[in-house]
Amino acid sequence: MMNSASVRWQLWIVAFGFFMQTLDTTIVNTALPSMAASLNESPLHMHSVIVSYVLTVAVMLPASGWLADRIGVKNIFFAAILLFTLGSLLCARSETLNELLASRVIQGIGGAMMVPVGRLTVMKIVPRDQYMAAMTFVTLPGQIGPLMGPALGGFLVEYASWHWIFLINLPVGIIGALATWFLMPNYTMRTQRFDISGFLWLAVGMATLTLALDGNRSLGIPPIAIFALITVGLIALLSYWLHARRNERALFNLRLFDTHTFSIGLTGGLLARIGSGMLPFMTPLFLQLGMGFSPFHAGLMMVPMVLGNMGMKRIVVQIVNRLGYRRVLIVSTLLLALVTALFALVALMQWIWMIPIVLFFLGMVNAIRFSTMNTLTLKDLPDTLASGGNSLMSMTMQLSTSLGVSIAGILLGMFSQPHMAAGSGETHMVFIYTYLSMIVIIALPALIFNRVPADTIKQSTLPRKS
């Protein structure tokens, strides 16, 4: 594929960055109960550890590409790895939940820049006719990360301590930073002026509203401060809307929403990912606290879901071409709600052998819906708006995951009782009520997807080599 050894090394550097970022998105979930015990917190209130990271990624994503073009991909990628590694070290040294949350924010700033800047690096070092092959190479470790994350996290927690889920990032991060500094050229390009005002309005709006959503229960923020956060958040989002209406170079052009499929895909996708974003957080928590599984056993149970997700992506195009976008989105959404209910039933009935089968099917359905949503959202955008639409969709994906985990944490807190024992009847009831609420949330986007036009253009498939 490549003739130049230096280019090959640069692709390996980007691949390791992808691996670090995607591994971290799943390795933490299995460790939350152990973290809670170590930090003297309730395991049902530990969702903020995930929210702080994912929300930071969502806030920082819009600025990452511009920074790479302006300052250089080498400098930004190097800084991203350093920040991610420093955040990992601080996470491992945290002795309170607040320290851990602050460290996750630092880690999230680095994680937000790694993947988009990595993609930009590949675009600059590889000829266009080799871009797909290069991206396939660098994203493969990114697919292995989520596969390894839950089981590796459970293994480290069970046989070492939760601190090691962050400490394992240190040697990889140091090697990656040194390799970036010595082997990667610092590509730059002329950029337009960055929309600082729009970026700040959106960042403030997303951060304050997400914090207000669960600040009272998980962080003890008083009601008057919650009201102030909601007010500030709504004013910030309204200010961005007014700013974007009169600014053609706004961070995200409002003309994006003139495309009907983009509007439906983005709003439906936001609500859909809130529901499905709960699943990677809730599943290992339910298996450990509700069913009494060990961290490693719970982590292993997550592997079939990732395998189902990876295996289904190859045939999504054929399914959409055969059934159409609207039918695929509606059926997959309702099917995901049904399979989620089936998982809770199978687990509570102690049919342990069926759990990995149901989770594999859950991953398959999730992959169909995700891939179809992403394609629908971007497929009709004009070329001049495609980049902005892709960035907005990426930001919305992270934001909706953050909201989903927050809402799952709120539901657990609403239904929980003090001093519940793992595997007890009271704990089972908490998870039953939470899963019933989740099923409704997961099914709701079907109402939005019902508005998808029936006459969609079929997607082409890549030709197979004979």
UniProtKB/Swiss-Prot annotation:
Its main location: membrane. It is found in: Cell inner membrane. The keyword Cell cycle does not apply. InterPro entries: EmrB-like, MFS, MFS_dom, MFS_trans_sf, Multi-R_MdtD. GO terms for cellular component: plasma membrane. It is a multi-pass membrane protein. Keywords: Cell inner membrane, Cell membrane, Membrane, Transmembrane, Transmembrane helix, Transport. Gene3D superfamilies: MFS general substrate transporter like domains (1.20.1250.20), Multidrug resistance protein D (1.20.1720.10). GO terms for molecular function: transmembrane transporter activity. The chain crosses the membrane at residues 11-31, 48-68, 71-91, 105-125, 137-157, 164-184, 194-214, 218-238, 262-282, 286-306, 328-347, 351-370, 403-423, 429-449. It holds the Pfam family MFS_1. Coiled coil: none annotated. PANTHER family: BLR6921 PROTEIN (PTHR42718:SF46), MAJOR FACILITATOR SUPERFAMILY MULTIDRUG TRANSPORTER MFSC (PTHR42718). Belongs to the major facilitator superfamily. TCR/Tet family. NCBIfam families: efflux_EmrB, PRK10504.1. This is Putative multidrug resistance protein MdtD. The lineage of its organism: Bacteria, Pseudomonadati, Pseudomonadota, Gammaproteobacteria, Enterobacterales.
